Amino acid sequence: MKIKSFLGKSLTLVVLGVFLFSGWKIGMELYENKHNQTILDDAKAVYTKDAATTNVNGEVRDELRDLQKLNKDMVGWLTIIDTEIDYPILQSKDNDYYLHHNYKNEKARAGSIFKDYRNTNEFLDKNTIIYGHNMKDGSMFADLRKYLDKDFLVAHPTFSYESGLTNYEVEIFAVYETTTDFYYIETEFPETTDFEDYLQKVKQQSVYTSNVKVSGKDRIITLSTCDTEKDYEKGRMVIQGKLVTK
């Protein structure tokens, strides 16, 4: 009887410990999500403090300069209407740092939205790649999945990107789920024909046929996030569009 009583109490303690740990973990996750949203709202307040101010091509907008005072790695701002995607873009010397840090250089599970370290600051490459986590709370790049709904794409065929010097409208021409086995993150191409071949391949991946005309002379932007529904480890959700100067 004593052994059964001991085992029963031990099992109760184990279950209680698991329950408390799970509660702590959920609480920490909620706190981190809230903190992440707060600091992003702080950045947005700086960026939108004078809504009447627009970027004059060739001149860095004052609000963007103010953001760069907070972190010199800020290189632009990305906005997709009717989504949570309205974020500063950062760029480091590698593609690892901002996976795990916010723009205040704090460790953060949500990381930041960031540009591939191989890309130049002012869209001189053929393919500029921007990464972000697919967060369960709907933040960061989670809303890219909205583009799997054709009605959403029809209503939102473009998104906006402001770099340090230029405002861009991005015309979406490809939406697809894939895995890391498909190498869509090439930034530069030796010849125009190589880029044209690449464009043909990504168009074939797309779940929609696009009317956007994109050629080897154009420059594109690629938005990439994890897609666990496609493949838990290697799945990716990708949106690609042609850069057009506003």
UniProtKB/Swiss-Prot annotation:
UniProt-recorded Gene Ontology molecular function terms: hydrolase activity
E.C. no: 3.4.22.-
Effect of a null allele: No visible phenotype in growth, no change in cell wall-anchoring of InlA, no effect on bacterial growth within host cells nor on virulence in a mouse infection model. Loss of cell wall-anchoring of Hbp2 (SvpA); Hbp2 is still secreted and runs with an apparent lower molecular weight in gels. A double srtA-srtB deletion mutant has no cell wall-anchored proteins. No cell wall anchoring of Hbp1 or Hbp2 (SvpA). Does not impair iron transport. Decreased binding and uptake of hemin at low (0.5 uM and 5 uM) but not high hemin concentrations (at 50 uM no effect is seen).
Name used for this protein in its record: Sortase B
Topology in membrane: Single-pass membrane protein
Protein localization: Cell membrane
Matching Gene3D superfamilies: Sortase (2.40.260.10)
Family statement drawn from the similarity comment of this UniProt entry: Belongs to the bacterial sortase family. Class B subfamily.
Alphabetized InterPro entries for the sequence: Sortase, Sortase_dom-sf, SrtB, SrtB_Firmicute
Entries under Pfam families matching the protein: Sortase
Induction of its expression: Strongly expressed in mid-log phase, cotranscribed with lmo2182 and lmo2180, the sixth gene in a possible lmo2186-lmo2180 operon. Induced under iron-deficient conditions and when fur (lmo1956, AC Q8Y5U9) is deleted. Induced when bacteria are grown in human cell lines. Decreased hemin-binding and hemin uptake by whole bacteria.
UniProt KW keywords: Cell membrane, Hydrolase, Membrane, Transmembrane, Transmembrane helix
Enzyme class per UniProt: hydrolase
Gene name of the encoded protein: srtB
Predominant location category: membrane
Biological function: Transpeptidase that anchors surface proteins to the cell wall. Recognizes and modifies its substrate by proteolytic cleavage of a C-terminal sorting signal. Following cleavage, a covalent intermediate is formed via a thioester bond between the sortase and its substrate, which is then transferred and covalently attached to the cell wall. Catalyzes a cell wall sorting reaction in which a surface protein with the consensus sorting signal NP(Q/K)(T/S)(N/G/S)(D/A) is cleaved between the fourth and fifth residues, and the fourth position is linked to the cell wall.
One GO term describing the cellular component: plasma membrane
Transmembrane segments: 5-24
Gene Ontology biological process terms, A to Z: cellular response to iron ion
